[in-house]
């Protein structure tokens, strides 16, 4: 239970599901891994007249909750999955040995069914895949790591994923039996039309940017994703110009950036510089 006195979302959903199914109400639990903030979320949906209606056991009733998920800027799920009552063992795919809940036979992708504006993503790998054909994982940066949110296929270095919600920043990886992810693309932004912008930093072209910090709060740390080292590299701050700004003069051009507090950077998103401003995933 959080300090606010409200239980965790998955526990609330499980409680509501058991209570409502006990009296014959058809209820399911749906889930997403956030792309515009950290961690994950679960909510319920009730079946009526052949259609599922989203609701939250703690917050909002049917239909209002789906509208909230689709319009509030820091929500907007990129993928939505439904927990099934019966396992779907008909799902078959070549297994690479990498373990993820996305492979569960009790999970169904319902992103398109839920009414979100989806697109099919097709992108070429920047690094040679380990084989001519393999599973690949679409990942979002979430609480200090890239977390898989969807499974796709790679064929001759072309990666494909179905029913993705755009206006999000992703990276694509292969999985291994050793439970490691190997990134085969640079991070990229895909907009709502499917246009792709890859973040490949130009270390020979540096830009200057003044970044804000909340008044009275600790200074932030700025990092950029190094596509060769495959981790976020810190960028030195030239000066703290006031109690609300920090000046950086050595930011690689076209870099994916992470601007976060040094301790427990929960909810502080990746982003990029555009038109002289730092845009983060909650801004679009």
Role assignments for model-derived ranges:
Residues 197-231, 281-284:
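Compositionally biased low-complexity segments at domain edges in trafficked proteins
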Residues 92-119:
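Beta-strand-rich domain onsets/edges
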Residues 117-129, 207-215:
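A short, amphipathic beta-strand motif
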Residues 49, 157-179, 244-265:
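Short Pro-Gly-centered beta-turn/loop motif in secreted/extracellular proteins
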Residues 176-202, 264-283:
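Structured interaction patches on ligand/partner-binding surfaces of diverse proteins
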Residues 134-152, 222-234:
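Short amphipathic beta-strand segments in non-cytosolic proteins
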Residues 4-5, 10-99:
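Hydrophobic/aromatic-rich core segments of domains that either
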């Amino acid at each position: 239970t959080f300090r606010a006195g409200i239980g965790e979302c998955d526990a609330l959903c499980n409680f509501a599901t058991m209570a409502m199914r006990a009296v014959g109400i058809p209820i399911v639990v749906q889930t997403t891994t956030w792309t515009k903030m950290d961690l994950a979320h679960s909510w319920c949906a009730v079946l009526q007249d052949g259609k599922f209606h989203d609701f939250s056991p703690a917050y909002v009733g049917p239909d209002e909750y789906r509208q909230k998920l689709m319009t509030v800027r820091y929500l907007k799920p990129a993928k939505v999955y439904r927990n099934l009552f019966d396992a779907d063992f008909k799902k078959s795919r070549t297994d690479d040995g990498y373990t993820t809940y996305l492979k569960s036979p009790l999970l169904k992708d319902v992103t398109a069914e839920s009414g979100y504006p989806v697109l099919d993503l097709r992108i070429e790998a920047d690094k040679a895949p380990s084989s001519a054909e393999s599973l690949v994982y679409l990942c979002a940066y979430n609480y200090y790591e890239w977390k898989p949110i969807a499974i796709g296929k790679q064929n001759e270095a072309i990666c494909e994923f179905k029913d993705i919600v755009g206006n999000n920043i992703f990276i694509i990886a292969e999985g291994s039996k050793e439970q490691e992810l190997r990134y085969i693309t640079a991070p990229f932004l895909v907009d709502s039309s499917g246009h792709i912008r890859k973040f490949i930093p130009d270390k020979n072209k540096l830009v200057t940017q003044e970044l804000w910090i909340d008044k009275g709060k600790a200074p932030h740390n700025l990092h950029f994703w190094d596509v060769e080292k495959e981790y976020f590299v810190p960028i030195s701050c030239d000066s703290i110009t006031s109690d609300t700004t920090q000046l950086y003069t050595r930011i690689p051009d076209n870099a994916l950036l992470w601007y976060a507090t040094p301790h427990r950077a929960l909810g502080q998103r990746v982003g990029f510089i555009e038109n002289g401003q730092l845009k983060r995933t909650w801004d679009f």
